[in-house]
Amino acid sequence: MSLSSLLWAFWYILPAYFANASPVLVGGGRPIDGGRYWKDGRRVFGDGKTWRGLIGGVAIGTAVGALQYFITPEFYGSLGKALLLAFLLSFGALFGDLVGSFFKRRIDLPRGSPAIGLDQLGFLISALAFAYPVKTLDSGQIIFLLVVSPFVHWGANYFAYKMGWKSVPW
Amino acid sequence: MSLSSLLWAFWYILPAYFANASPVLVGGGRPIDGGRYWKDGRRVFGDGKTWRGLIGGVAIGTAVGALQYFITPEFYGSLGKALLLAFLLSFGALFGDLVGSFFKRRIDLPRGSPAIGLDQLGFLISALAFAYPVKTLDSGQIIFLLVVSPFVHWGANYFAYKMGWKSVPW
């Protein structure tokens, strides 16, 4: 495992990180569950998961992929492949986040409360799974991302909290 | 991704699953933190993490690896490599679990309360990282294990709860 292979792993996953972080900035609006309740009497996803956050996050992540293609075209091969990869990483990240919210509501964690592990890893695993058919990393790079992403995630959230973008530091 | 490659992924990770599950059966005894408190006034790991659970779990996981070698020697190459791999997978799994307990105590989750995600993925990621230098999987197999392990984990814990081995179903 060379240093450059670890940097390429971050470069690969960047759209997923942007998509996962962007609802903090572009979120709000109509909730995806339309205010509906699950059969346990609790919200399906909650007010924290909105269409604007989902669509905005996928758009931002995919735009990041377009920028990445123009910086390192040889890493992607073609603009079409770069855009498809970034779309799948972004959609995968937000889909994983949504599934996480579903499980958090089911065990009755209130919106915004931490699910230590799920919040830091669910979006990443989902992004890796969605993007796998188009382009993947080697196993060492994946293990590296899994080990360091929780710390990146906590650092980024603490920064967003200090900047006043989030009301809680996780 | 063929079916057999997914079955090999389970076969590879089996010592980690056994090590992670075994403290339920062989646990108890003297806690690893010796009853000591962290500077936040809470226990370092708590009474749930004991020397007997750690050593018993590593022993059971490594014994599983020895059995695996005699069933599929060609997968490991040599008994020494199979034992080393099983030891690293088992120790890695329990080390990840211990780190998870440390973080759970820091955010003041009581012993046994669920950290959705961390409990299902922390031991797995740690096992994969420790075992990586000896033998690893391909990226598709790793992503597969990450996606399905939470469900295996929940199923196994629910079974242990129904059998009366655990007091809570998670």
Curated annotation (Swiss-Prot), chains A, B:
Its EC number is 2.7.7.67. One of its GO terms (molecular function) is CDP-2,3-bis-(O-geranylgeranyl)-sn-glycerol synthase activity. It holds the Pfam family CarS-like. It comes from the Archaea. The keyword Zinc does not apply. It is found in: Cell membrane. The keyword Coiled coil does not apply. The chain crosses the membrane at residues 6-26, 53-73, 83-103, 114-134, 140-160. Keywords: Cell membrane, Lipid biosynthesis, Lipid metabolism, Magnesium, Membrane, Phospholipid biosynthesis, Phospholipid metabolism, Transferase, Transmembrane, Transmembrane helix. It is a multi-pass membrane protein. GO terms for biological process: glycerophospholipid biosynthetic process. Pathway: Membrane lipid metabolism; glycerophospholipid metabolism. Its cofactor is Mg(2+). One of its GO terms (cellular component) is plasma membrane. PANTHER family: CDP-ARCHAEOL SYNTHASE. Belongs to the CDP-archaeol synthase family. Catalyzes the formation of CDP-2,3-bis-(O-geranylgeranyl)-sn-glycerol (CDP-archaeol) from 2,3-bis-(O-geranylgeranyl)-sn-glycerol 1-phosphate (DGGGP) and CTP. This reaction is the third ether-bond-formation step in the biosynthesis of archaeal membrane lipids. This is CDP-archaeol synthase. It comes from Thermococcus onnurineus (strain NA1). The gene is carS.
